[in-house]
């Protein structure tokens, strides 16, 4: 598939599923799991540090897989892949599910505060 690397990557929905599955599988490879664990430990659940430590490692892992499918081996290639996946999410529930699994591998779960808008008065002002 060497000729594809010279052209912009265009994947069908079925091909996108295959690539997503390969990317997710790459995160479970022992060496990548260690890299991600170390990055998460360094980040200490701090969102700013997640961007500093975890996101670059996650990007590198994705790059290693998607370059075989014609995406550039840089941050731009990962962004193009993410945009392509996003374009298929609404049409294909399996792609949406795989995309969610991929994001969960490197984005911390977003938790909402336990109170609703009506109970905002219980928050102490400092």
Curated annotation (Swiss-Prot):
InterPro entries: P_C10. The modification N-acetylalanine is found at residue 2. The keyword Cytoplasm applies. Signal peptide: none annotated. Keywords: Acetylation, Cytoplasm. Pfam families: P_C10 (PF14974). Its main location: cytoplasm. Ubiquitously expressed, with higher expression in lung. It comes from the Eukaryota. It is found in: Cytoplasm. One of its GO terms (biological process) is psychomotor behavior. GO terms for cellular component: cytoplasm; nuclear speck. In brain, may be required for corpus callosum development. PANTHER family: PROTEIN C10 (PTHR13463:SF3). Belongs to the UPF0456 family. This is Protein C10. It comes from Mus musculus.
């Amino acid at each position: 598939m060497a000729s594809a690397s010279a052209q912009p990557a265009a994947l069908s929905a079925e091909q996108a599923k295959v690539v997503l599955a390969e990317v997710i599988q790459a995160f479970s490879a022992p060496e990548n799991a260690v890299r991600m664990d170390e990055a998460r430990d360094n980040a200490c659940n701090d969102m700013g540090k997640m961007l500093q430590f975890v996101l670059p490692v996650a990007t590198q892992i994705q790059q290693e897989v998607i370059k075989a499918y014609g995406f550039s081996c840089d941050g731009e290639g990962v962004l193009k892949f993410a945009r392509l996946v996003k374009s298929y999410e609404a049409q294909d529930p399996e792609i949406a599910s795989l995309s969610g699994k991929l994001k969960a591998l490197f984005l911390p779960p977003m938790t909402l505060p336990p109170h609703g808008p009506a109970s905002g008065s219980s928050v102490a002002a400092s």
